């Protein structure tokens, strides 16, 4: 394996909603150009952890973070951090498509336009490139000026990925990207993740309950589980193949076997 370069370093991270502790003492690294999967039972803080990686958690009220999250060696929780720039560099795709009520083109171009003025021809190229990167161009190139809300659920989710890719992030966070999709649409999203993994330097972090999918698309896996007080903790982190075939912790082994059989 080539040398692993940490893009994100998480050190002793704890997270609170008001006075309720959701995560406790999480430490791990996210490596450049690798896919890291976050797995674990429902309610163990996986999605909360994901949102800690670009401060999306701050969109909710009364939250508190302890510890450090470093993006290329800068603590993202320092006050001087530009949140708009951070969220462009560490972009997120949510479980359900959250498209704007506008055309396919305008959805993809939106993030590009708010960064600063660009000639229309340049934006056209960016939109086309992002749709191609999301394996969507050939399917919808004839209707990019029609409403994005008319697309199928799977196409809408890939459009959300295209919108994220358009601003050239360093890291793409995906929270259950196949949630609610039929098997065919889910497979297309999975194929897209595998394609991005092979042909780009993009770093991806994915929350998923589908361990079969995780085994196919990820390089590393982090297993989270609630403790006796139902506070999410990182139980084990390592190479996906090793985690699934010979985990160190009995709790990891029990969870993987219960999901994969």
Swiss-Prot record:
Q: Which Pfam families match?
A: ABC_tran (PF00005)
Q: Which gene encodes it?
A: pstB1
The main location class comes to membrane
Q: Which domain of life is it from?
A: Bacteria
PANTHER family, alphabetized: ABC TRANSPORTER I FAMILY MEMBER 17 (PTHR43423), PHOSPHATE IMPORT ATP-BINDING PROTEIN PSTB 3 (PTHR43423:SF9)
- NCBIfam families tied to this protein: PRK14258.1
| Residue numbers binding ATP | 40-47
Q: Which InterPro entries match?
A: AAA+_ATPase (IPR003593), ABC_transporter-like_ATP-bd (IPR003439), ABC_transporter-like_CS (IPR017871), P-loop_NTPase (IPR027417), PstB-like (IPR005670)
Reactions that this protein is recorded to catalyse: phosphate(out) + ATP + H2O = ADP + 2 phosphate(in) + H(+)
Q: How does it sit in the membrane?
A: Peripheral membrane protein
> Which species expresses this protein natively?
Nostoc sp. (strain PCC 7120 / SAG 25.82 / UTEX 2576)
Q: Which UniProt keywords apply?
A: ATP-binding, Cell inner membrane, Cell membrane, Membrane, Nucleotide-binding, Phosphate transport, Translocase, Transport
Q: Which GO terms describe its cellular component?
A: plasma membrane
Q: Which residues form the ABC transporter domain?
A: 8-256
Q: What Gene3D superfamilies does the record point to?
A: P-loop containing nucleotide triphosphate hydrolases
According to UniProt, the name of this protein is: Phosphate import ATP-binding protein PstB 1
Q: What class of enzyme is it?
A: translocase
Family stated for the protein in its record: Belongs to the ABC transporter superfamily. Phosphate importer (TC 3.A.1.7) family.
- What are the EC numbers? 7.3.2.1
Q: What Gene Ontology biological process does one annotation of this record name?
A: phosphate ion transmembrane transport
Q: How does it assemble?
A: The complex is composed of two ATP-binding proteins (PstB), two transmembrane proteins (PstC and PstA) and a solute-binding protein (PstS).
């Amino acid at each position: 394996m080539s040398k692993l370069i940490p893009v994100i370093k998480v050190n002793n991270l704890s997270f609170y909603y008001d006075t309720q502790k959701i995560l406790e003492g999480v430490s791990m690294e996210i490596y450049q150009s690798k896919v890291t999967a976050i797995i674990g039972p429902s309610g163990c803080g996986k999605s909360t952890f994901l949102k800690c990686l670009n401060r999306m958690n701050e969109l909710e009220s009364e939250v508190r973070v302890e510890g450090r999250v470093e993006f290329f060696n800068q603590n993202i929780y320092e006050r001087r951090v530009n949140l708009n720039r951070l969220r462009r560099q560490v972009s997120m795709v949510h479980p359900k498509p959250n498209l704007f009520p506008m055309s396919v083109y305008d959805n993809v171009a939106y993030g590009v336009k708010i960064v600063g003025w660009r000639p229309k021809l340049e934006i056209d190229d960016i939109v086309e490139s992002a749709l191609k990167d999301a394996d969507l161009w050939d399917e919808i190139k004839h209707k990019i000026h029609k409403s994005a809300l008319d697309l199928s659920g799977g196409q809408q989710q890939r459009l959300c990925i295209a919108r994220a890719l358009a601003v050239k992030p360093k890291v793409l966070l995906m929270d259950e990207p196949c949630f609610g999709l039929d098997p065919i649409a889910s497979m297309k999203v999975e194929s897209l993740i595998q394609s991005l993994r092979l042909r780009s330097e993009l770093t991806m972090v994915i929350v998923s309950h589908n361990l079969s999918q995780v085994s196919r698309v990820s390089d590393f896996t982090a297993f989270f589980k609630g403790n006796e007080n139902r506070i999410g903790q990182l139980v084990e982190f390592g190479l996906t193949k090793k985690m699934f075939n010979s985990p160190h912790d009995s709790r990891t082994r029990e969870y993987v076997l219960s999901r994969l059989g």
